[in-house]
Amino acid sequence: MQKQELLYKGKAKSVYETEDNDLLILHFRDDTSALDGKRIEQLARKGVVNNRFNAFIMQKLADAGIETHFEKQLSDDEVLVKRLDMIPVECVVRNFAAGSLVRRLGLEEGQALTPPTYELFYKDDALGDPMVNESISISLGWANDAQLVKMKELSHQVNEVLTALFDAGDLILVDFKLEFGVFHDRIVLGDEFSPDGCRIWDKATKKKLDKDRFRQSLGDVIEAYEEVASRIGVPLS
């Protein structure tokens, strides 16, 4: 499959057309961003680590019966995916309080959330990815009711699969975001799953092993990503 013209350049990935209208190539770059793209740095090995991490997770989800856009890994930093008509909302599942939830509600970081919470955010960096709900999503034509129900159902299924996977590596999956799109009238998981889009803590020490290390200038960002990968069985070589 040959990479053709650039279709879209995001904060950390570039999307390319292919000769097949149903397929795209994602290139994972070393770019790392925070503050809705206002802070961007290059971190060596990040593109390779995230591509391999994502391929591993997507295969685990597919094995559990969750349809994703992942087709196959093409190289160290490229992957072939289905072309989805993306729904412009992020689905956020939280098992423990962290990040914006702590700031909004004055919760203690690490407070257990039982059952896990589920939130929707409109994907727009200029607006700061504001929280929205199903009613707004339907009224503005982003998705219909059946699609939103399916997205919520799949988000909780992903959580069940991945909390068990991370727990086996003595890790806590604190929270994560997912993006979905439509492929031939089906809701399909898109984008990526990597430490860029979730929070992962060491179970014993609560050490942060995700993108918060970059956001909070804690250092050793990629080393933390690689540690998580090693502990859940991601092949990095």
Swiss-Prot record:
It is an enzyme of class 6 (ligase). Its EC number is 6.3.2.6. It catalyses: 5-amino-1-(5-phospho-D-ribosyl)imidazole-4-carboxylate + L-aspartate + ATP = (2S)-2-[5-amino-1-(5-phospho-beta-D-ribosyl)imidazole-4-carboxamido]succinate + ADP + phosphate + 2 H(+). Gene3D superfamilies: ATP-grasp fold, B domain (3.30.470.20), Phosphorylase Kinase, domain 1 (3.30.200.20). Keywords: ATP-binding, Ligase, Nucleotide-binding, Purine biosynthesis. One of its GO terms (biological process) is 'de novo' IMP biosynthetic process. GO terms for cellular component: cytosol. Pathway: Purine metabolism; IMP biosynthesis via de novo pathway; 5-amino-1-(5-phospho-D-ribosyl)imidazole-4-carboxamide from 5-amino-1-(5-phospho-D-ribosyl)imidazole-4-carboxylate: step 1/2. It holds the Pfam family SAICAR_synt. One of its GO terms (molecular function) is ATP binding. Belongs to the SAICAR synthetase family. This is Phosphoribosylaminoimidazole-succinocarboxamide synthase. It comes from Psychrobacter cryohalolentis (strain ATCC BAA-1226 / DSM 17306 / VKM B-2378 / K5).
